[in-house]
Amino acid sequence: MKAQLAILSLLVGLLAAQDLRSLLDICANPPKTTPKTLSDKISLPESYKISGSMTDWMKASTSLLVESASKEFRVLEKQTRDQMPEKWIQELTGAKLTSFINVTSGECIGNVSKPDLFKISRFESIIGADTSSLYSIILGLIEFDKSHTGFFVEDHVEVVGGVNAQKWVTCIDGATANDTKVLLEVRYAGEETIRPAQSPFSNPLLLSIRLAELPNFNSTVALNHVSVELDRYELPVGNEAAVVHGVWCKNRNDTVLVLKPLDEYAAILNYFDPSTNRSDVVEVLYSKTKKVIHIAGDSFENGVKLFKATPKRYKNGTDYILHDFNYGYEFTMSHGACQSFSPLDDSSEDVLVKNGTDHFIMNNMEWLLVDPGLRFSLYESDVDMVGTAFKTYRAYDGRDETIVELHVTEDMEVHSMARFRMGSRHLAVSLTVQRIPMESSRLNMKTVQLSNCYDEQKFANNTLMVQIKDKTLSDLSQVGLNGLNEAVASSISKNVHPIIPYRVIVFYVESRDSGLEMIVRVAEKTEKKPGNVVGYNYTTELTTAEIFKLMNDSMTLDKMPIEVLKNNGVKEEWMADASTMKMYPPENDDGFIGYTGGAMFVLAIFCLLIGVSIGAVGVFVATRRQRISTLAYQVFE
């Protein structure tokens, strides 16, 4: 751009020597041809990008201008020799504010006055008082032309920008005899000349405007003399109103954003910290319907940014967290194994205390991604590498003196976000979001997968066996073990007594007559009181023995239907045969640690297959016995 300025300055010097006499002769001796008006076709379309120069002949200075417009913004860029480049961005919708940016320093001030390309009072009656843009100057010229005529310079052909230019001149007297005079010259491409290279531009195409204020039309010494020349017409690229990353404009009408609700949401979040060159990738599954939020990642040793949790909150190796707002508990896991089970508390960003109560409720997912305390203003829209259009908002966070840049889709869903250091404009952290379908998320875990976290390993009399009427393993294959587990837990809560589903674990065996027999384990009620959530009464949980007695009563009366969902979408009701119900292990087995002969035989074969000695089997306690020798007891007892 500096090279362009140097060339332009040379041209200014040459053109400044031009004599106004030939044009003033037209004012003194008007041609005999009929005066004509300019065409209003020289107006600019809604979207455009034009470049050129503005020259003040009396000050011997010139400026390069680039102006662009879209439906949302009009942008003017100006550069003058020995001055830092300047940029004005005017909103064309909403509050219609104007922001000024020092392009070199990056300083931005919102809600400033419009710029003045030149401010000469005598010219206001001709081009209007608004000289903030080339667009407004051209509009003023068209409005002036509605009541004024001029003359085309005959037998005078100029080639400007590769097209034949027509010259139109008008001489303007003052309101009184003592008022100064004004000479107005307009050059434009005639309708018969070569058409512009890009549509929607068409001839006549404005090429230049020149205004000279004179004491009278006999004087060739101007009091004020300015010109504007346009040398390029094109369509905007789309990012002309962009403010460089890390810059926030002061004094704008910042507001709290209304983001798209994310009540059912699954996504992969990638947090990147350039200072450590480290990415923390986490998967999140949020369901307001199910009142749960799951988070999983490689490790949370740097904390959980989504919860604003510090590294000290979770142990090294934690890679899964579940917050269950139905029952008020937090579960954590590491490498697929249970790590902790604890009451839900409000030290995490996703847990809110409902106004006027002490009850815990879920924070909105959109506000976990974007701090609801920040106030944003709109910047220019953009398109990412895959063609997704998004809006850009920015806010200043005084707590850590960072600039937050937020990208959202047209319907205001979070697309990505970045934080920049105030002043240096260095990136502090970035967030990119990749949405995934809820149903395909690997975090769609069943309650049985977390039952080991709840179970406090109190094994006495907490397992029973019962046969399902008229069902076989083939029927189970159409439902799945997890599906059966959920159905049994749901049936107990609906038909027997309300119970937290994490207490229920279901497995199966095949009976002697090839029927389906299920093993139901109901863990003892935990001694850990839950967080204070709405809907779950911890005090009503019964002991396992009490639950089993009620289950037996309900099954005997066929009042405990198990509603399962088959893989073809059809629901069925399964019924347990109460006459086959028995405790597992048998009640007459008190204090016995060992195996029957048949069981030992089966276990010996099992141990040989997996390379474990029979001697090792002898130290198995009752817990292993119920899990490993199920088939042995079923066959040999």
From Swiss-Prot:
Residues 1-600 are extracellular. The keyword Membrane applies. The chain crosses the membrane at residues 601-621. It is found in: Membrane. Glycans are attached at residues 102, 111, 178, 218, 253, 277, 316, 355, 461, 537, 552. The keyword Iron-sulfur does not apply. Keywords: Glycoprotein, Membrane, Transmembrane, Transmembrane helix. GO terms for cellular component: membrane. It is a single-pass membrane protein. Residues 622-637 are cytoplasmic. Its main location: membrane. This is Uncharacterized protein Y92H12BR.3. It comes from Caenorhabditis elegans.
